[in-house]
Every structure is written in C-alpha cells, then in structure tokens.
Amino acid sequence: MSSNQIALKNLVSMETLSNEEVMALIKRGIEFKNGAKANYDEQHIVANLFFEPSTRTHKAFEVAELKLGCDLLDFDVKTSSVNKGETLYDTILTMSALGVDICVIRHPEVDYYKELVESPTITTSIVNGGDGSGQHPSQSLLDLMTIYQEFGHFEGLKVAIAGDLDHSRVAKSNMQILKRLGAELYFAGPEEWRSEEFSHYGEFVTIDEVVDKVDVMMFLRVQHERHDYESIFSKENYHRLHGLTQERYDRMKDTAILMHPAPVNRDVEIADHLVEAPKSRIVEQMTNGVFVRMAIIEAVLKGREK
C-alpha cells in the first residue's frame, strides 16, 4: 500500500488498522515531516471536541489540520449545549447535520465512539483522540513513528512499558500493535496497576530487570485524575521504586531511547533533568505528533471520497 493512498472511514482504535495501514500512516507522517504537501480541490471542515483536558493531542491536531488547509471548528464544552444536558450522540449528530467532515473527539467514556460510527444518520467521520482508559490511536502512531525513525524496524525490538499500566490508554494501544509488529514487550510498574490483560502481550518484570536490556524504555504518566496514587506511594517512593533515576538512565544501552506520552510528572516517572537528556525522544514524539496526525486526517478525508 502506497503511503499516500491509505483511506479510512474512521480511526477509533489501533485494533481496526492492519499492519499495512499502520506502516502506511507512519511512512506518510515521515513524508509530511520531510516536506510533502497535500492538495485538495475543496475545503474540509474539522471539529475538535475535547471533553477532557489536553494540550499536546488537541493542539497537535489543530496544527495538523491547519497545515492541511482545513477549516477548524473548535468546540468549547463549557459554552456548548452539553451544559444543558445534550448527549454526545446529539452533539455529533448536530456536527454531521452542519456538514462537518471529521470530528476529533476525546471523551472520558471508554468506547464512546461505537454508537457514533454505527449510526446510519451520522455521516461525519470520527477520529478518536482518546477514550477514557481505552484507546489512544494517534498517540500510538506517533510513538511508532518515533521508534521507526530511530531503528527502521519493529521486529525483534525489546520494548519496556513502565508505570500506570491499568489506567493508560497509551499502554493498551501500544501493546497491541507493537506485539503485532514483532516487538518483544515487558511491563513494569506497581503490582496494584497490572491487570491480567497485559500478560497476553508480554512479561511482567521490575524496571531494574530490563532497563539495561531494552531498546525502548517507555514510561507512562501516573493518572492522578483516575485514582489517588498517593494513598499507595509518596512521589519520592514512586520515583525510587518505579521511575527513571540517573542510575537507571546510566544503565540504559547507548542505542536505547527514552519515551513518554507526556505530560511528564517530573521527578515522579522521570527525573527532572533527564526529560531532555540525550537518549530522550520526548520532544521528538511531540513533533512527530503533528505529522502523523496530518497522515491520519488525510487518510480519513480520502476515505470520505470513496
């Protein structure tokens, strides 16, 4: 499949993408990063509806849409009819009736998108910007793009995902696709935040068992808004037991990279001074987020043409 010929009706989960489609999106993101342009004969309208706080995902989608020449219809939850009790379904039904081509949505409800993509009335396409602790496909794709740029392949790479596993949509999206692409996965973090689901994709370990063996060390944000982690750990204890300290950083392979979906809780998941260390690709992830989201929006617009 050519990188600029992928066409998607919606993008709601990594599970709905084939390996071929994933690679096409990654390669198209790299092409956009290298200066490729997309040209459209007509204007397209994209609405960004974020029902949870977001900086990177929200603004990266906006920049991606602007770079593609789309008209943006930004949606402020605080001033919308959501405050009058309007359901998500009726909000998106309205967007569809107004002629919006794509709705990018972040919502706290897991699988919120199912009734939207199954509706015979809603014609707008749905791009999932994160559904509770469910899926985060655009973050997963930018992570994959970052790894692919570094190593040129996924087969045989050793990847450790460490931290707040159970509450992380990033972990769930990444474990599924990385396993499919041939990576060897390890999961580290507090036992309280490990569900059996992860054991189907990799091995549970301590961070000290793998930090010197893996190619990718991916830390996860502690999800303060989804649980009270300080009832189990102090910030200092969490960092000492499960975070990236200087000593652990020094043990990483010279060719290994450090990743985090951000925002980083500095001195909790990663020592403050290591966030921009030489092995860190956290800033690169943010940059790649714009270009892979350009690839996503382009692919969905192509899907609407069919």
Swiss-Prot record:
Keywords: Pyrimidine biosynthesis, Transferase
A GO-annotated cellular component: cytosol
Catalyzed chemical reaction(s): carbamoyl phosphate + L-aspartate = N-carbamoyl-L-aspartate + phosphate + H(+)
Residues given in the record as L-aspartate binding sites: K84, R169, R221
GO terms for biological process, alphabetical: 'de novo' pyrimidine nucleobase biosynthetic process; 'de novo' UMP biosynthetic process; amino acid metabolic process
InterPro entries: Asp/Orn_carbamoyltranf_P-bd (IPR006132), Asp/Orn_carbamoylTrfase (IPR006130), Asp/Orn_carbamoylTrfase_sf (IPR036901), Asp_carbamoyltransf (IPR002082), Asp_carbamoyltransf_Asp/Orn-bd (IPR006131)
PROSITE patterns: CARBAMOYLTRANSFERASE (PS00097)
EC code(s) of this entry: 2.1.3.2
Superkingdom of source: Bacteria
Assembly behavior: Heterododecamer (2C3:3R2) of six catalytic PyrB chains organized as two trimers (C3), and six regulatory PyrI chains organized as three dimers (R2).
Family, per entry: Belongs to the aspartate/ornithine carbamoyltransferase superfamily. ATCase family.
Reported function: Catalyzes the condensation of carbamoyl phosphate and aspartate to form carbamoyl aspartate and inorganic phosphate, the committed step in the de novo pyrimidine nucleotide biosynthesis pathway.
Listed name of the protein: Aspartate carbamoyltransferase catalytic subunit
